[in-house]
Curated annotation (Swiss-Prot):
Family: Belongs to the papillomaviridae L1 protein family.
Segments of this protein annotated with the region Disordered: 511-531
The entry's keywords: Capsid protein, Disulfide bond, Host nucleus, Host-virus interaction, Late protein, T=7 icosahedral capsid protein, Viral attachment to host cell, Viral penetration into host cytoplasm, Virion, Virus endocytosis by host, Virus entry into host cell
BP term (GO), one: endocytosis involved in viral entry into host cell
Gene Ontology cellular-component terms listed: host cell nucleus; T=7 icosahedral viral capsid
Originating species: Human papillomavirus type 10
Keyword flag NADP: no
Gene Ontology terms, MF aspect: structural molecule activity
Name this protein carries in UniProt: Major capsid protein L1
The keyword Ubl conjugation belongs to this UniProt entry's keyword annotation: no
Primary location class: virion
Subcellular location: Virion; Host nucleus
Chain's role: Forms an icosahedral capsid with a T=7 symmetry and a 50 nm diameter. The capsid is composed of 72 pentamers linked to each other by disulfide bonds and associated with L2 proteins. Binds to heparan sulfate proteoglycans on cell surface of basal layer keratinocytes to provide initial virion attachment. This binding mediates a conformational change in the virus capsid that facilitates efficient infection. The virion enters the host cell via endocytosis. During virus trafficking, L1 protein dissociates from the viral DNA and the genomic DNA is released to the host nucleus.
Pfam families per UniProt: Late_protein_L1 (PF00500)
Amino acid sequence: MAGISIFGLLPFTSPDIVAVNVSHIFLQMALWRSSDNLVYLPPTPVSKVLSTDDYVTRTNIYYYAGTSRLLTVGHPYFPIPKSSNNKVDVPKVSAFQYRVFRVRLPDPNKFGLPDARIYNPDAERLVWACTGVEVGRGQPLGVGLSGHPLYNKLEDTENSNIAHGPIGQDSRDNISVDNKQTQLCIIGCTPPMGEHWGKGTPCRNPPAQGDCPPLELITSPIQDGDMVDTGYGAMDFTALQLNKSDVPIDICQSTCKYPDYLGMAAEPYGDSMFFYLRREQLFARHFFNRASAVGDAIPDTFILKSNGGGRDVGSAVYSPTPSGSMVTSEAQLFNKPYWLRRAQGHNNGICWANQLFVTVVDTTRSTNMCLCVPSEASPATTYDATKFKEYLRHGEEYDLQFIFQLCKVTLTPDIMAYLHTMNSSLLEDWNFGLTLPPSTSLEDTYRFLSSSAITCQKDTPPTEKQDPYAKLNFWDVDLKDRFSLDLSQFPLGRKFLLQLGVRSRSAVSVRKRPATSATGSTAAKRKRTKK
């Protein structure tokens, strides 16, 4: 009888098994530890934004629409209130303001169409697509000056021979500049967005008196009358320059905005900017430094002080005066047609909500008209400057022309859900309502809502549709009665037909006189011979 012993088991005996040598086996369990590396989940898929070409069908019907001559006149630097109250008597009209036209279009679904069979009103809706635009500008080219009678100027740092000593209490001077030259045109179906630097909110304790405030980049819609960047930066001068002397008077109490091209280009649906035209020109004309105490002192490691009683270090807060230089008709962006074939975003020119926003800036026609009138009733016989009054006015002239293409949208369930996600008011404008799922909770409904015996009930929402841009200021242009199919009767329409290669036939047929056949024989000429 032999015995077998295995580690971990009790020995047992068997008469039929011979003795076998078995070595001991030791099993050691490993301790599992989680990895110190971060576990990254797969990225969330980005919701796909469709191009309007994927669900909008274009027809071969084009309309022309144009405005009348649009004029505006005012003071180029500031609004002038009435003497009796604070109402504005003369508005501020400057070439360095944005002109944002809100163009209202007729509803194509309620429009008199040449052929009613082009779409099915039960399953389709009509929309406008902007395919051509021309922004006309009147008035001659000119340069309008801006400035400040008390401009914060300490020294001419370009031509100064020696730095000045301690600054006085008031070293301001009367300085005028010709601002930065800008030509801009933005087309979209929502207002354009602008950006500027404003006063931010500190994270900890508020800054002490005299400390530099934090800055914040603010994005807001560009409205009609907002100031453009004139060469001093896009910032809120009212909140960030409290001395009211660092910039010209036309912007010292304003906010200069710069178009947020990056934000509008990254917009998912591409409604605020179908395309844009831009030309900017600027150079520094004069170089000054600022008065007042320097907030950020120059470190001692940056300069070497002179021996003995050296002079004080001057102000290192430098600031140039801008200049837009020469204006010329060869560099004009206006008074010429532009055809929209492919937009930069997903919206290829579709005018949702039957409206279009045209943003224009043109500083090449910035002439300020000087008006002089006598202050006395008697006619002047000799010149006396005290007997005359000088006034400033600025006038602008615009003309907008468009070519619109009639398009239709097939309202499938997927397209309707997509449009509702993009803009929920579109389906409401098309008389489509959404049925909300029934509520599973028990709600209270009182019978007499106006009774004083019950608690005050919530006000019912207004039935009228609210204008989302009611609180914004735009130049409203109504084109609901200015659409025409006769493209050949309008300047932009003829240019559009010409670039399509379509010739308009004359309505008057010209009758040609048939050639008469010669019945008689012509006499042969005798050949001259020299004798």
